[in-house]
Curated annotation (Swiss-Prot):
PROSITE patterns: CARBAMOYLTRANSFERASE (PS00097). It comes from the Bacteria. It is an enzyme of class 2 (transferase). InterPro entries: Asp/Orn_carbamoyltranf_P-bd (IPR006132), Asp/Orn_carbamoylTrfase (IPR006130), Asp/Orn_carbamoylTrfase_sf (IPR036901), Asp_carbamoyltransf_Asp/Orn-bd (IPR006131), Orn/put_carbamltrans (IPR002292), OTCase_ArgI (IPR024904). This is Ornithine carbamoyltransferase. Pathway: Amino-acid biosynthesis; L-arginine biosynthesis; L-arginine from L-ornithine and carbamoyl phosphate: step 1/3. The gene is argF. Belongs to the aspartate/ornithine carbamoyltransferase superfamily. OTCase family.
Length: 312
């Protein structure tokens, strides 16, 4: 998404055209290949990425930090307690000030609206590294991972098990952008937000919703799940018992296509949403997903910065 000043923000998969998302994905593949071949790329030497963390993280922090360093740049981390974003200082003012210091801003926060307001007033690119509503960087890594293992994602079917959370919202947006299908199995009361499903369907995604996990898994090319309780939402969580039928185990995987992959954004609660047998099994690609956060996010950073004349 570009604002009125022509700044490219990576807000959601719905805000970036399909052609540009495909270009980012192919760039991620190329950058990964060059890194594995030992090539050193430093197009953003001297550039700085501000990383705002109002929700803690391992994968997001390390992958963005390492990614920016591999591109030749530097990072500075700002925690929620340090920032007091929107409390001691207006978000608009923070956005304007940071834009005078750094070349891009990454934010991992709670309310989606806080990230949107930051992007509205920033004069440098803003990257959504996670909100309570969406997780677009993770899904770019997931699409990259699927295509590495199984080829083009077009026409394939992903099956989601469990809570209708932020990762699922970005997954259905990806289904519209990359032309694949999503079967959603959630217990009643844990469905995804309707605006994400409605947008995905209106933009060509095949979305099926059910309370039956076996129906959703039937013939699927990939089974995806996440924790039953999202970070920071423990006080509002439903009892685990309602999710037990949605555990990804060997019996559920057997309903999918024999070549189906298993994905999880991690961290996983082993023995809850997924069994050890599945997450450690031959169909699991969870650690490839984790690695691919690095490569996908490097390509996202490059996409955000290229049009500003900052490297390639």
């Amino acid at each position: 998404m570009a604002n009125d000043n022509g700044i490219k923000h990576f807000i959601d998969l719905s805000t970036v055209p399909a052609t540009e998302l495909r270009a980012i994905l192919e760039d991620a593949k190329a950058r990964k290949a060059r890194l594995k071949a030992g090539e050193v790329e430093r197009p953003y030497a001297g550039k700085v990425l501000a990383m705002i963390f109002e929700k803690p993280s391992t994968r997001t922090r390390v992958s963005f930090d390492v990614g920016m360093r591999q591109l030749g740049g530097e990072t500075i981390m700002l925690t929620g307690s340090e920032m007091q974003l929107g409390r001691s200082e207006a978000i608009a003012d923070t956005a304007k000030v940071l834009s005078r210091y750094v070349d891009a801003i990454m934010i991992r926060t709670t309310a989606h609206e806080r990230m949107l307001e930051l992007a509205e007033y920033a004069t440098v690119p803003v990257i959504n590294a996670l909100t309570d509503d969406t997780h677009p960087c993770q899904i770019m890594a997931d699409v990259l991972t699927y295509e590495e293992h199984r080829g083009p994602i077009k026409g394939k079917t992903f099956a989601w098990m469990g809570d209708g959370n932020n990762v699922l919202h970005s997954l259905v947006e990806a289904a519209a952008r990359f032309d694949f299908n999503v079967n959603i199995a959630t217990p009643k009361g844990s469905e995804p937000k309707s605006q994400y499903i409605d947008w995905a369907r209106a933009n060509g995604a095949g979305i099926m919703s059910t309370t039956d996990p076996e129906k959703a898994a039937s013939g699927a090319d990939c089974i995806v799940t996440d924790t039953w309780v999202s970070m920071g939402q423990e006080d509002h969580a439903r009892g685990h018992n309602v999710f037990i039928p949605y555990q990804v185990n060997a019996n559920l995987m057997a309903k999918a296509d024999p070549k189906a992959l298993f994905m999880h954004c991690l961290p996983a609660h082993r023995g809850e949403e997924v069994t050890d047998e599945v997450i450690d099994g031959p169909q699991s690609v969870v650690f490839d997903e984790a690695e691919n956060r690095l490569h996908a996010q490097k390509a996202i950073l490059a996409w955000c910065l290229q049009d500003r004349g900052l490297g390639a």
